[in-house]
């Protein structure tokens, strides 16, 4: 079958031919319809330090997808041939304390689809049936293919009660923009997003944020004054991994504020911890999606009217995958969809 693989320990992704995966007793075989390119896939393409330490070569990459069930393991119940599914990209062990306690998103033995095991940038994918999620009929293939990153946004945004709160989102990448849209949709008062990439800030404006602030041109404190905010932000969603953005967030949080961190900062990032202590801030790390509460919330948000369509900016045939990666690497894109049909 056709697949996009990391074949060499150097920059690039290559189209290749690999054997179709075998279906285990507890697995589903999924015929891929559409996939989306993640920032992780770009890291793998660039062959950065993280990729060199993490990715075995060769490896079929990709973990954002929608497809159709075409094979079912003999022990699997609850799925039928023809079901349209996406799936959780974190494969968990099922036997550690967190897994047994219903906190599978915190499994210490997690392996990643397209990172530690073959991914979805292929004509067929095998995953445990436990990880598959049926897509409601009124959700499009395009939207279903971005459920994985949308789940990161939902998990981060819904970590805290947002109704009536003032929310700061730092980082207007696709996940940050979707998190801001979720916050606005569920009843936050002011949702302010910051970045220095004007293209992506414009995407955030299309998604309905209160203010999209280019911090290279505009002061966040001036924007807060313009909005009549006198006590700081109640909730911070840190999506950038950029130390200056996180320091600004700490400066502008209200006392007792709550921060959810999805962005991955440098290991040696320094902050003024007195602001965390004396403001009584609560900081929560976010990894992946809650299984599977986040997935049900994702579907419900879209079915209740949340419009994510502006975040999908580019669509290509899989044969034009290089154009898709070029768009992602340019920084002038939202989500990029690759069609396998």
Curated annotation (Swiss-Prot):
Reaction it catalyzes: L-threonine + NAD(+) = (2S)-2-amino-3-oxobutanoate + NADH + H(+)
E.C. no: 1.1.1.103
Designated name of the protein: L-threonine 3-dehydrogenase
Entries under PROSITE patterns matching the protein: ADH_ZINC
Any Pfam family: ADH_zinc_N
Cofactor: Zn(2+)
Function noted in UniProt: Catalyzes the NAD(+)-dependent oxidation of L-threonine to 2-amino-3-ketobutyrate.
GO cellular component, one term: cytoplasm
InterPro entries from the UniProt entry: ADH-like_C (IPR013149), ADH-like_N (IPR013154), ADH_Zn_CS (IPR002328), GroES-like_sf (IPR011032), L-Threonine_3-DHase (IPR004627), NAD(P)-bd_dom_sf (IPR036291), PKS_ER (IPR020843), Zn_alcohol_dh (IPR050129)
Keyword Zinc annotated: yes
SMART domains, per the entry: PKS_ER
Origin species: Salmonella arizonae (strain ATCC BAA-731 / CDC346-86 / RSK2980)
């Amino acid at each position: 079958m056709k697949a996009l693989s990391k074949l060499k320990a150097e920059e690039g992704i290559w189209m290749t031919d690999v054997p179709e995966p075998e279906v285990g007793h507890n697995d589903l075989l999924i015929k891929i319809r559409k996939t989306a390119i993640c920032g992780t896939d770009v890291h793998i393409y660039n062959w950065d330090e993280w990729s060199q330490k993490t990715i075995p070569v060769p490896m079929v990459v990709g973990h954002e997808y929608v497809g159709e069930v075409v094979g079912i393991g003999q022990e699997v119940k609850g799925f039928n041939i023809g079901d349209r599914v996406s799936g959780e990209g974190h494969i968990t062990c099922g036997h550690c304390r967190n897994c047994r306690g219903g906190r599978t998103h915190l499994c210490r033995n997690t392996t990643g689809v397209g990172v530690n095991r073959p991914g979805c940038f292929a004509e067929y994918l095998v995953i445990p049936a436990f990880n598959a999620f049926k897509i409601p009929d009124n959700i499009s293939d395009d939207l279903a293919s971005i459920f994985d990153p949308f789940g990161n946004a939902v998990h981060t945004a819904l970590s805290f009660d947002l109704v009536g709160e003032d929310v700061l989102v730092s980082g207007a990448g696709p996940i940050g923009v979707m998190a801001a849209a979720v916050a606005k949709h569920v009843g936050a008062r002011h949702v302010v997003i910051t970045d220095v990439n004007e293209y992506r800030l414009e995407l955030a404006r299309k998604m309905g944020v209160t203010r999209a602030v280019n911090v290279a041109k505009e002061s966040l404190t001036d924007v807060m004054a313009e909005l009549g905010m006198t006590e700081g932000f109640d909730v911070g969603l840190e999506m950038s991994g950029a130390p200056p953005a996180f320091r600004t967030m700490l400066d502008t949080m209200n006392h007792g504020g709550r921060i959810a961190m999805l962005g991955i900062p440098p290991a040696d990032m320094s902050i003024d911890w007195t602001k965390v202590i004396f403001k009584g801030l609560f900081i929560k790390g976010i990894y992946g999606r809650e299984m599977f509460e986040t997935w049900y919330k994702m579907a419900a948000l879209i079915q209740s009217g949340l419009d994510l369509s502006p975040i999908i900016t580019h669509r290509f045939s899989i044969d034009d995958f290089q154009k898709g990666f070029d768009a992602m690497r340019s920084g002038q894109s939202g989500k990029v969809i690759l069609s396998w049909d």
